[in-house]
Amino acid sequence: MLSSWVRCLGALLFLASVAQAQFQFFEHMFGGGHQEHHQQNTQNSASDSARYQQLWEGTNCNKYLCPGTLACVDFPHHCPCAHPNVEDKVELGEGSAVCISKGGYKPGEAARKIELARKGLL
């Protein structure tokens, strides 16, 4: 008889702990648990262009100021890519250039695909 009470009590404690874990999961998923949330809450940057405009206006350049990187270059097609580790710069031939994702291609493959697309072959 004592053994059945111990089993029953053990099963009840097990079910209670599973239920508690489930409620903590849902509370965390749906915005509860505010104590932890306030510690990790950081201010996101504004979604307007005011910060960019301040940087633009504060940059000294007597040549061409690249809009994507704020680099000062002689000609627009000399602008560097904003993310050179993952982008290739492809000059289009009429004084313009584009930065495209390397996308895991072999070196020069992205430029080749752009050239094929410009010729209507892709």
UniProtKB/Swiss-Prot annotation:
Signal peptide interval: 1-21
Keyword Flavoprotein: no
GO-annotated biological processes: ERAD pathway
Superkingdom of origin: Eukaryota
Coiled coil start-end: none
Signal as UniProt keyword: yes
InterPro entries to which the protein is assigned, alphabetical: LCL2 (IPR034543)
Alphabetical UniProt keywords: Signal
Task performed by this protein: Probable component of the endoplasmic reticulum-associated degradation (ERAD) pathway.
Protein family per UniProt: Belongs to the LCL2 family.
UniProt name for this protein: Long chronological lifespan protein 2
Organism of origin: Aspergillus fumigatus (strain CBS 144.89 / FGSC A1163 / CEA10) (Neosartorya fumigata)
